[in-house]
Amino acid sequence: FVFGRGGEEAEGLAAAGIACETIPGISAAQGAAAATGIPLTHRETAGMLVYATGHLQGAQEDRTVQLDWEALARPWQTVVIYMGVGTLPVVCEQLVAHGLPESTPAALVERATLPEQRCIVGTVATLPALGVRYGVKPPALIMIGEAVGRQVVPPGGAGMVSSNF
């Protein structure tokens, strides 16, 4: 139920009198972190974790996303943006405009935990161009923060791409 339509679907089923079952699991962000070796928190760089959406209903018309950019640009946290591939340039631009250093480590994790997973690592300044260069498509997560720079590549390191930030 993290930014997916799970809650909406459950409401619709309940309204129609259809029983449904929710099976607990892990979030896409947790799976991506484990699969790529990117820590979501790290006691030296990130004591907070923030999940946000990069896609809001109606946002496609003008490519804007209404988020608390000042809060998302704070230090000492990792920010994971769900559904943000289409608004990646705006997300990165707004974070920098609100005080996040351009050199902040950032990653795009495409198709996390699947065999065709790719992890593209750069900085908040370089990530939009890297996304275009490597043709990143949804589903993908954006992970931003100093903890991203603490990535420990898992055995095999399949799908890892780095821009040597």
Where are these regions (language model features)?
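Short beta-strand/loop turn elements enriched in aromatics
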Residues: 38-43, 98
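Structured adenosyl-cofactor binding patch, chiefly the S-adenosyl-L-methionine
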Residues: 29-40
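A short, small-residue-rich loop immediately preceding and capping a beta-strand
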Residues: 1
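Active-site nucleophile and cofactor-binding loops and adjacent substrate-binding regions
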Residues: 22-28
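A contiguous loop/helix-start segment that scaffolds small-molecule binding in enzyme catalytic cores
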Residues: 4-12, 18, 46-48, 53-165
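Hydrophobic beta-strand scaffold residues
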Residues: 20-22, 40
